Every structure is written in C-alpha cells, then in structure tokens.
UniProtKB/Swiss-Prot annotation:
Role summary: Component of the Mediator complex, a coactivator involved in the regulated transcription of nearly all RNA polymerase II-dependent genes. Mediator functions as a bridge to convey information from gene-specific regulatory proteins to the basal RNA polymerase II transcription machinery. Mediator is recruited to promoters by direct interactions with regulatory proteins and serves as a scaffold for the assembly of a functional preinitiation complex with RNA polymerase II and the general transcription factors.
Gene that encodes the chain: MED6
Statement: the UniProt record of this protein carries the keyword Transcription regulation: yes
Name of protein: Mediator of RNA polymerase II transcription subunit 6
InterPro entries: Mediator_Med6, Mediator_Med6_sf
Keyword Nucleus: yes
Amino acid sequence: MEEREESISFVDQRFLGSKPLDDTNVLEYFSGSPFYDKSCNNEILKMQTQFRGLDQKSKLFSMVGIFYEVESSNHEKTLFVIRKAYNHGDTAETLGMYYIIHGHVYAAPTNYSIYRCRMGDSMWQLNSFIDRMMEKRRFNPFSPPKGRRLAKSLEDSKDLDFMMEIFNDFKKEQAES
C-alpha cells in the first residue's frame, strides 16, 4: 500500500551540511525528496540547459506539463513554499503544495483531508455527547406511557432541560480540556 504524501517528511542532512537553503538552491534540494516527480518539465529543462546557461524560468512556463516553482519564502530563509502545477499552455492548474521548514520537506494537506479530519472530529464530539447523555438518561422502554397530555408536556420540558444541562456540561468539559 502506498504511503500518503501527507504522512511522510524528508530531510537531507548531507545537502544541508554542505550549503544553507536559499531561493537559488531550494528546488535542487526539493528534487531529492520523494515528493518530486522526476519526469517534470524542471528535469527536462535542467538536462537541456545545464551547459548552455539559458534562463530556465522563462522556458518553464511555456512548456506544457508538470512543473515546480518556489511560491514564496520568508526573510530568514527557513520557510519555503513550493507549488506543483500542470501547465496547460494558457493556464496553470495547481496540483499540490509543499513546504520546507528548516530543511524538512512536507506535503501541505489537501482540502479533502482537512474536511475529512474536521468531520471525523465533529463525529467524535457528537458521539461523545450522545454517550454522555445516555449515561445520565434513565429510560425504560417497558414503563407504561403517561395517560394525560399535561403530564406528557411536563415530561417533555424536563427532558429538554435535562438534555440542555448535559450539553452545557459537555461544552464546559471540552473548553477546559
């Protein structure tokens, strides 16, 4: 089973020991990571221009296919954001984002993984609330129903108060932890 990009990281201590990362060599460093596609346009241009000294950046945006570019970096050169994109000719579609923090390369989470994580957290919270409510609730399916409507409406309001009390207790516990 292939490991998901979001769960792995990469660091090359040998590269970092030989020279510090900056805007000129960060893509070279990134090319050694498992996130880098060796068949991208950056590699093709590197082979074609390595002895000619041509500007790769201007050629890169005119080629159709996958390419990588440094999207941004901070002033201290400890954080770099790298964009993986597919150039269709007239437009470029972002395929992924990666970031390098102090030499460690990570894949940025996708919208899907963020939503999935948030939904999982929400479901866990809801399940915890229901479990807590069921611990405090005294329900007997075999008890006979109340005959009068007034008694029923009073019981419903007690149930609502009871549920609100449990919910507020649960919210307080979550805020404290």
